[in-house]
Amino acid sequence: MALNKRELFQKRRLRVRNKLRKISDGRPRLSVHRSSKNISVQVIDDVKGVTLAAASSLEKDLGVVGKNNVEAAAKIGAAIAERAKKAGVEEVIFDRGGFLFHGKIKALADAAREGGLKF
């Protein structure tokens, strides 16, 4: 039986999340969500259950033109790296969810690494 697009996404998401649980070691999680119009990212401390930092293409002060493209993802990645460092976070685990590590997700991850986050 062939799986549809949504089922493949859910299968990937569960596989990624289970791998992250095994290697987390108490490090915060850099969680990415991409919709058809926007991109958002959070640094989440799963031990305490709190969000330490967040950035989104919906924020006016980031100056994102075209809210869901590679350039916007790079700006959001740089912003989350800066905000995470202010919150005292330098090392995270990258949680791409069910999204492929390609295009916008890759641009966001590369910009966050250049901003000083280690993962």
From Swiss-Prot:
SUPFAM superfamilies (UniProt xref): Translational machinery components
GO molecular function per UniProt: 5S rRNA binding; structural constituent of ribosome
Keywords: Ribonucleoprotein, Ribosomal protein, RNA-binding, rRNA-binding
A GO CC term assigned to this protein in UniProt: cytosolic large ribosomal subunit
GO biological process, alphabetically ordered: translation
Keyword Nuclease: no
Annotated InterPro entries: Ribosomal_uL18_bac-type, Ribosomal_uL18_bac/euk
Family to which this protein belongs: Belongs to the universal ribosomal protein uL18 family.
NCBIfam families registered for this protein in UniProt: L18_bact (TIGR00060)
Function, as annotated: This is one of the proteins that bind and probably mediate the attachment of the 5S RNA into the large ribosomal subunit, where it forms part of the central protuberance.
Subunit structure as annotated in this protein's UniProt entry: Part of the 50S ribosomal subunit; part of the 5S rRNA/L5/L18/L25 subcomplex. Contacts the 5S and 23S rRNAs.
Protein name: Large ribosomal subunit protein uL18
